[in-house]
Amino acid sequence: MSRTKSTKVLIIGAGVSGLKAAETILSKSFLTGDDVLVVEAQNRIGGRLKTTDTSQSKLGINYDLGASWFHDSLNNIVLNHMINDGLLDDEKDVYFDDKDLKTFSSTGEVPIVDKKLNRVLEDIEKYIQLYFNRNLGVPDLSLRDIVAQYFEKYNRLITEEQREYCGRMMRYLEFWFGISWDRISGKYAVTTHQGRNLLNKKGYGYLVESLAKRIPESSLLLEEPVNKIIRNNKDAGKRVLVETINGLQIFCDYLIVTVPQSILSLEESSPYSIKWEPKLPQRLVESINSIHFGALGKVIFEFDRIFWDNSKDRFQIIADHTDGDLSRELTELPKPFTYPLFAVNFGRVHNGKASLVILTQAPLTNYLETHPDQAWQYYQPMLQKLSINDEPIPDPINTIVTDWTTNPYIRGSYSTMYTNDDPSDLIISLSGDFEDLGISEPYIKFAGEHTTSEGTGCVHGAYMSGIYAADCILENIFRNDVTGYTIIG
């Protein structure tokens, strides 16, 4: 038997963009909890923000399994709001973990300073920018191919050691895009950042809790996966009908859709897809499919002692030379040093507690999240390189592996750029600001990190998109709704 609810504004998704949209609508208008409803597929709120409980750690540490940093810290609205709201002590709750990396390869420590390797990396990145900016119509190349092109063109100016290491060191960008470098778009590989990256020691769970406290509990519906949106509804005096797999029908006047791009792009035949009636315009469907979804994961190892140089913030272990198809689906554990390693030293972040937080990229993320018991087997030979005096390293006393790629409602980490991808159409179409683009209904808006050109893939991007979508809905209500709701501020 179907159940029904009716509300003025419905928000699909209780991630940071959905929660911020709901909080914005409630705080900027005289709408109440009866007027705003947030429906979430999972049994928790937060979306891709997830902070562990200390009970999951043998060392009493809270880990962010999703986003961990305040990126673009000079212009980060979330950082500023959390400090202004008293949620963050900028002296003890955050840490700039950007001391120069200590880098290793399978043969030992990499001579970063003596061989001027970072200077060559800077040159490679500048070459990539110049190549695509000077030739706006030039076909895209993968990061691997554009780096190879650089070495071919400037081989005469590069030393043997720089040739040996620098190409492999450029694979650090895999930890930004969540995919291997043979798939990363060269055109979008090098970006400009608005400030340093500030590690959130306290955890983003506090942001989620703070937003949720400003939304009535009755306005949050969990474990209700949406499977249909009827955007031209004629029943119950409401313009939109949303249905869930559990048989719940929700009628609303305004809708904000915040599900990840990975869900929007699913074929209708998938049991986790959302069916639209009428179907979305073909151009919008094409724009949704014009980008992809990355798989940045984490493997956390806790030990009974620190065996690495605890004066360092982070470690990088570069991969061996590999010419194969790095992006293919893994059916067995790859050899160590096939994919690079990036580790954050939580021993320095948390006062001597022996913990390393390792970032992973697709397809390794997908494999390890499916086979978490094999994580140590892959990383142990690589982490051995960090050992002081080359003493045998201990086995971990605790291992935590993320599960983002196995979560059917998320399916990865955040939007990313494959070679030949272009995010501009998607961002323009989902904004709803341009006539004949996106969908024609002004009472339906989209939000999420994939809908914005500022802070794409980041918490502050999702947060700002929630504010923007909410403001658009409120403006529409104020302009057109006969009930005459007032907007505050």
Curated annotation (Swiss-Prot):
Q: Name one GO biological process term.
A: spermine catabolic process
Q: Name one Pfam family in it.
A: Amino_oxidase
Keywords attached to this entry: Lipid-binding, Steroid-binding
GO molecular-function terms, A-Z: oxidoreductase activity; polyamine oxidase activity; steroid binding
Q: Where are the transmembrane segments?
A: none
Q: Name one GO cellular component term.
A: fungal biofilm matrix
Family according to the record: To yeast FMS1.
Purpose of the protein: May be a flavoprotein with enzymatic activity.
Q: What is this protein called?
A: Corticosteroid-binding protein
Lineage, please? Eukaryota, Fungi, Dikarya, Ascomycota, Saccharomycotina
Designated gene of the protein:
CBP1
